[in-house]
Amino acid sequence: LPQATRIRATFAAEDVAVIGLHTVFEHHAAMTPTSLQAFLHEYRIHFPVGVDRAGIDGAPTPRTMSAYFMQGTPTLTLIDAAGVIRYQYFGQVSDMLLGAQIAELVQEANALHSRSAEKMATQKSQPQTAGCDDQGCTI
């Protein structure tokens, strides 16, 4: 959680979404959403934290952990702007490496956004004429 808090403080919210996942392996009765809210308040965690659901058919690994092939906690997953898992770490990862990888993904997303904006501007600047050609009909 301290590293996630540093990421949230370092990168702009429009560039990087920080989301926590509360996983429960034991003492389920004590690990309620209410106790999680108290923990987040006490430790001043200011990013969303989801509560993982129990494993399917009593499996010991919670559902989201299974879906993302997480080996345990802590796990850190970097997902790019297209929704593709690009990096995943089990255990600690250095802030320097993580910062460089996040910056790389932000730069890729910004470049993709710029290319999309340029393409839209080019399409808008081309005159639209009504009629049909080999490609189809415009209105």
Listing of model-derived features with the role each one plays in the protein:
Residues L1-Y43, A54-T64:
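Structural microenvironment flanking redox-active thiols in thiol-disulfide oxidoreductases
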Residues A30-T34, V93, C137:
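Short coil/turn linker and secondary-structure boundary residues
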Residues Y43-I45, V51-A103:
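Thiol/disulfide oxidoreductase modules built on the thioredoxin-like
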Residues A100-I139:
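Non-globular targeting/processing and membrane-anchoring segments
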